[in-house]
UniProtKB/Swiss-Prot annotation:
Protein's recorded name: Chloride channel protein 2
GO biological process terms held by the UniProt record: chloride transmembrane transport; chloride transport; renal water homeostasis; renal water transport; transepithelial chloride transport; transepithelial water transport
Membrane topology annotation: Multi-pass membrane protein
Pfam entry (one): Voltage_CLC
Segments dipping into the membrane without crossing: 245-252, 320-332, 336-344, 576-590, 591-592, 593-604, 605-609
GO cellular component assignments: actin cytoskeleton; apical plasma membrane; basal plasma membrane; chloride channel complex; plasma membrane
Family affiliation: Belongs to the chloride channel (TC 2.A.49) family.
Subcellular location per the Swiss-Prot or TrEMBL entry: Membrane
Cytoplasmic topological segments: 1-168, 627-1193
Extra information: The CLC channel family contains both chloride channels and proton-coupled anion transporters that exchange chloride or another anion for protons. The absence of conserved gating glutamate residues is typical for family members that function as channels.
Impact upon substituting E286G: In RNA edited version
Binding residue positions for chloride: S243, F538, Y632
Compositional bias segments (type: Polar residues): 1165-1193
Length: 1193
């Protein structure tokens, strides 16, 4: 308030002076400009007030941090005991702007514009925030750099793996385990699906008297299961929605899809698929099983990687994923051979033959265990096929029928292409309707519930479901479609008639039901596949083809009731064979695979129709491939997954378009001799790049190799990390100690040279200090008083120079806190010594004072004294530490020492005691109180009495007792340890006692020995200012990659700039690379990744690719592109940073891993702030391409 009052008076005085000046000005120049002057002066005063308010207002946290970083203060030595060796530190008072508390020089006295208390609180708050950020970023850096730490459990697991599984063959055990796990999952899921389906049919059949209740029971269960599956999948892992084969096809191509191979996705996929198929919706499980097997393989690889590093290799991981795809199909249909071939056709374009045995072995293990589980738990008589058929093997078909089979393949090819087209158009229609799409996104359960209700209502057996065999499950429907008797025949057995009753009604015949069933499955499967739940597409199209083939077979049986004549022999028509051919042809046309023929043979257990099946599948594939892509490629296009498409044969530009037409020219690179600061800038600005090309210099751009991002970050961490910083801090401390010792030595030498020897003895005159000392000595115990008297009777020291004519006597050892007394001690030194002695006397007096309210039980020795047990009270090391001291601490300590010496040598000890000491000892022994309640004590148990006639050496050795006062980090006492050396022959056993004043804890601690915990070692680190300055200097140094032991890939994949896009596509597809560097005569000119190649191929296939115009002058230049950092920029003018994550100055909200400060060094060595330069604007395509290349490098 006084401060603001002074400011107000000064302001009024200034205004009065200014008003007088304005009056004089008006009298001289007239009154016409008075109003103008007043308005201008009012504006000026308003501006000054705003300026003062802005100056007096406290800066925000970000501004304060920037202020501190821009103007480093003088280095602190209060809490960091290791100053840097540089002595030309910047003075904090060199500039007025450097004063953080706003000191202003006035006419008489200085004045502070800020509250010191608030300033201290702000500083403490900033330090707390910086420390918190430092710890968080330290954890992030450890996670990125340090990787996995080896633990004892991992080492044990590694040892067990090496001596058990590794000896049998790692891949064999891994693949067998993968197959067994998938078989178990498939069996469990089938069991759950059958339970849901049987429950639905049981409810329908049990409520025959009430049709409406039957309808409710028939509809409610599918709706509930679909809603549960949709909600569960959406909450746990939305990545599990759909088939999974398109995603696996993309992943095996080298693209990393986030969260698609995690444990959460596995749980959501298994539970969601079980609920979906249990609802009775026309969906399949083959695609989801491929995804599930891939997830299991990925999780097993991570498990094995923890104690076997071979599975960390990306190529080995992709091999295991390829085998997992085969296991998924094999465990789903018990078809190992067809599963391997199907997974190869569906997921990969170029397959490595070395993975064949892996896929076959894992698929055979899975299929075998899956069928054995059916024998063990489903009462199967033996290992059988999934859809067992019993076609006659003598004449299964006639050659004339091959034409009909080919016709079935042609129709199925057209139908498969139309199926894919309708599916894609329906999905795009649902997406294009933005209003409906927005409404369905807000109401996620409305669309799945409505479709489930619609499909189950249509399939209700008492309604339209009687035309669709609605009472049958999917397995029963396929089994009956594959039956080897003619449904339209009149002479049917009871079992055959029971089968036909599901496929004909009183309103329709077998043909009508088959047509309705095929069309219904065709339409509903397309609609149901859009429900956001895990589902497959293979079983629905398999059923569609089986229904169409059965329809053709029944038509052939009616047309040729006696069979087809060939070579004088009639062969009967088997409609079941036509159903098998139709199922293989339609599913092959939709998936664009030929291996479905092998799957059909394994599922039916017969190869009687191998020729018709192969002919139909080939014709259907040929027709469908010309019209539409496969269903999985169509989903890739719909989801816009980053998969590399194929070049169409009709593309005319595949030979005239080169890699230089679509490569990225803005390449991020490093070079030999790059500084650590520039390297970190490159890493910071390109966080998604996992490798960087290495060139010789920014001028020549000769490609020398590539370096992984992890290696570069580890190199920076090694250069200025915590270990390096601690080493430098220790070195600085050592140098500081050496300098301090040298300075002290020089100072003593100078003092000795300046002092002149005297022949006289300097004696201090009696003063108040000496009188106070005498008064304090009288209050001391007898022994200490005798020692003080003995010390006072010692002869005074002479200050004369020691020569041959003088013999100085031996002087007593000085006290612990007193200065060393030399023959040249002056009066000042003696005065200081007397002052310290006076304070020590006061402290000793405080330790001997009685408590104001003494304990009535105080003053007696513990009962253990009668059993030769002695309690040794501890004297507090610092006055005032112990809150309650009942006995004179120093007297008790002398008493204990005398008791030990008495047992060692009682004769000599008793004879050497003074009378006062004997009286005190006798008085102390006469007490019967428990001294353990008074102060911390140490108990000595005399197990055997020592011999009286011991040597003085033994007595001296036995009396050595060591006390280790352990003090914690904050100065709090922890525990006290006391022991006698092992060579003690008395047999004393010393117990550790906690230093505390609680009697109960003391009693417990005396009875039970406790361990001793050593205090934490003090870590010597730099101050934030020193650390910042040191890191700035270290970051300016150039990098020597050879000394840094950085692993450099000397042969990264390179392409010449004139390589055609056809060769680039073939190389990327066969080799499986994700990016390649483009060179011109050895110089790096660009980089191409999957994104650029895919975009170019799509444009070429659509005839919309426009090659960029080439600049002829640019080709003549030696350097095609300007480097990321200009070559003329020196290391002294680049952006500086504090890299270490545990630095207090390396935290910022706008930078996640590495904070960068922008400063420049002047010629004088001072640091001045510069604004960060604006980043060069890149095209969006370049940024995206670099991001994608980094993700797949």
């Amino acid at each position: 308030m006084v401060y603001f009052g002074d400011r107000q008076r000064d302001r009024n005085r200034d205004r009065s002076n200014q008003k007088v000046e304005r009056i004089i000005h008006d009298e001289e120049f007239g009154e016409e400009n008075v109003e103008l002057v007043d308005s201008e002066w009012a504006d000026f005063e308003k501006f000054i007030c705003q300026l003062r308010k802005r100056r007096n207002s406290a800066m925000s946290m970000e501004e304060e941090l920037r202020h501190v970083q821009r103007h480093p203060k003088i280095k602190s030595h209060a809490f960091y005991p290791c100053p840097p060796p540089a002595e030309n530190a910047r003075d904090s008072d060199s500039s007025d702007d450097d004063d953080p508390i706003g000191y202003i020089d006035t006419l008489m006295y200085g004045r502070y514009t800020k509250d010191l208390g608030e300033f201290a609180k702000d500083e403490a708050r900033k330090l707390k925030i910086l420390e918190k950020r430092r710890k968080q970023e330290d954890k992030q850096r450890n996670k990125e750099l340090l990787g996995k730490h080896s633990t004892r459990a991992k080492r044990v697991s590694s040892w067990i793996w090496r001596h058990t599984v590794a000896r049998l063959g790692e891949d064999w055990v891994f693949l067998a385990l993968l197959g067994i796990i998938m078989a178990l999952l498939s069996f469990i899921m089938d069991k759950g699906i059958s339970i849901c389906t049987n429950a639905r049919i049981w409810l329908y059949r049990d409520l025959t008297s009430q049709p409406f209740v039957q309808y409710i029971a028939w509809v409610s269960l599918p709706v509930c299961l679909i809603l549960f599956s949709a909600g569960f999948v959406h909450l746990i892992a939305p990545q599990s929605i759909g088939s999974g084969i398109p995603e696996m096809k993309t992943i095996l191509r080298g693209v990393q899809l986030k969260e698609y191979l995690t444990f959460k996705t596995l749980v959501a996929k298994v539970i969601g698929l079980t609920a979906t198929l249990g609802s009775g919706m026309p969906l399949g499980k083959e695609g989801p099983f491929v995804h599930i097997a891939s997830i299991v393989a990925q999780l097993l690889s991570k498990l094995v990687t923890s104690f076997q590093g071979i599975y960390e290799n990306e190529s080995r991981n992709s091999e295991m994923l390829a085998a997992a795809c085969a296991v998924g199909v094999g465990a789903c249909f018990a078809a190992p051979v067809g599963g391997v071939l199907f997974s190869i056709e569906v997921t990969t374009t170029y397959f490595a033959v070395r993975n064949y045995w892996r896929g076959f072995f894992a698929a055979v293990c899975g299929a075998t265990v899956f069928r054995l589980l059916a024998v063990w738990f489903q009462n199967a008589d033996t290992v059988r096929a999934l859809f067992l058929t019993n076609f006659t093997t003598e004449f299964p078909f006639d050659p004339q029928e091959l034409f009909v089979f080919a016709l079935i393949g042609l129709v199925c090819g057209l139908g498969g292409a139309s199926y894919v087209w309708v599916h894609r158009r329906y999905v795009l229609f649902m997406r294009s309707n933005k209003r409906m799409n927005k409404f369905l996104q807000k109401n996620r359960f409305l669309y799945p519930g409505f479709l489930a209700l619609l499909v189950s209502s249509i399939s209700f057996p008492l309604g339209t479901g009687q035309f669709l065999a609605g009472e049958l499950s999917t397995h029963e429907q396929v089994t009956q479609l594959f039956s080897n008797f003619t449904w339209s025949r009149d002479d049917l057995t009871v079992e055959q008639a029971a089968v036909v009753t599901h496929w004909m009604t009183s309103y329709t015949s077998v043909f009508g039901n088959l047509v309705i069933y095929t069309l219904f499955t065709f339409v509903v499967s397309i609609i149901a596949s859009t429900i956001p739940v895990p589902s497959g597409m293979f079983i629905p199209v398999f059923k569609i083809g089986a229904g169409f083939g059965r329809l053709v077979g029944e038509f052939m049986a009616v047309t040729f009731p006696h069979g087809v004549r060939y070579g004088g022999r009639l062969s009967p028509i088997m409609p079941g064979g036509y159903a098998v051919v139709g199922a293989a042809a339609f599913s092959g046309s939709v998936t664009h695979t030929v291996s479905v023929a092998v799957i059909i043979f394994e599922m039916t257990g017969q190869i009687t129709h191998v020729v018709p099946v192969m002919i139909a599948v080939l014709v259907a594939n040929a027709v469908a491939a010309l019209l539409q892509p496969s269903i999985y490629d169509s989903i890739i296009l719909i989801k816009k997954l980053p998969y590399l498409p194929d070049l169409l044969p009709s593309s005319s530009g595949m030979y005239s378009i080169f890699v230089e037409d679509f490569m990225v020219r803005d390449v991020k690179y490093i070079w030999h001799g790059i500084s650590y600061q520039k390297l970190k800038e490159v890493l910071k600005l390109n966080k998604t790049l996992r490798s960087l090309p290495l060139v010789d210099s920014p001028d020549n751009m000769i490609l020398l190799g590539s370096v992984q991002r992890y290696e570069l970050i580890k190199m920076i961490e090694k250069h200025i990390g915590r270990e390096k910083r601690m080493e430098v801090a220790q070195k600085w401390q050592k140098e500081a100690q050496e300098r301090a010792l040298e300075e002290e030595k020089k100072k003593q030498e100078v003092e000795l040279k300046m002092r002149r020897p005297s022949r006289f003895e300097v004696l201090p005159a009696p003063d108040i200090l000496s009188l106070r000392q005498i008064a304090n000595d009288e209050m001391l115990p007898p022994k200490k008083r005798a020692e003080t008297m003995h010390g006072s009777l010692a002869p005074r020291k002479s200050i004369l120079k020691k020569t041959n004519s003088f013999n100085l006597k031996t002087y007593a050892q000085p006290m612990g806190h007193s200065p060393s007394i030399t023959p040249y001690t002056t009066i000042t030194g003696n005065s200081e010594f007397r002052i310290r002695s006076a304070f020590e006397a006061i402290f000793k007096k405080s330790t001997t004072l009685q408590d104001v309210q003494p304990d009535p039980e105080t003053g007696s020795l513990s009962p253990a004294a009668s059993n030769h047990e002695v309690e040794v009270p501890r004297t507090p090391s610092t006055p005032g530490v112990s809150k309650k001291v009942q006995l004179p601490a120093q007297s008790n300590w002398d008493f204990v020492t005398d008791q030990i010496m008495l047992q060692v040598n009682p004769i000599s000890t008793e004879s050497n005691k003074m009378p006062a000491e004997k009286d005190f000892t006798d008085k102390a022994l006469s007490n019967n109180g428990d001294s353990s309640k008074q102060s911390p004590s140490i108990k000595f148990k005399a197990n055997k009495v020592a011999d009286v006639n011991r040597s003085p050496q033994t007595a001296k050795r036995c009396s050595k007792i060591r006390f280790a006062n352990e003090v914690g980090v904050n100065g709090s006492p922890t525990r006290t340890k006391c022991k006698i050396k092992p060579e003690n022959v008395l047999g004393y056993s010393i117990e550790d006692v906690d230093e505390t004043t609680n009697p109960e804890s003391l009693a417990e601690s005396i009875q039970k020995p406790k361990s001793v915990r050593l205090p934490r070692e003090r870590v010597i680190d730099m101050s934030p200012e020193d650390q910042k300055q040191w890191e700035l200097e270290e970051m300016l140094k150039p990098i020597d990659l050879q000394k840094a032991n950085v692993h450099i890939d000397p042969s990264p994949f390179q392409l010449v700039e004139r390589t055609s896009i056809l060769k680039v596509h073939s190389l990327f597809s066969m080799v499986g690379i994700n990016h390649a560097y483009v060179t011109k005569i050895g110089r790096l000119v660009g980089v191409v990744g999957l994104k650029e190649l895919r975009k170019a191929i799509e444009d070429i296939n659509s005839n919309s690719f426009v090659p960029p115009t080439r600049d002829e002058d640019a080709d003549e230049k030696p350097a095609v592109e300007k480097p990321l950092l200009s070559t003329n920029s020196s290391d002294k003018a680049v952006d500086m940073t504090v890299t270490s994550m545990d630095s207090a100055l390396s935290n910022s909200e706008n930078c996640s891993d590495i904070e960068m400060e922008h400063i420049k060094h002047t010629d004088k060595g001072t640091v001045s702030l510069t604004m960060p330069p604006q980043e060069s604007k890149q095209s969006p395509s370049a940024d995206k391409s670099n991001t994608e290349n980094g993700n797949h490098a």
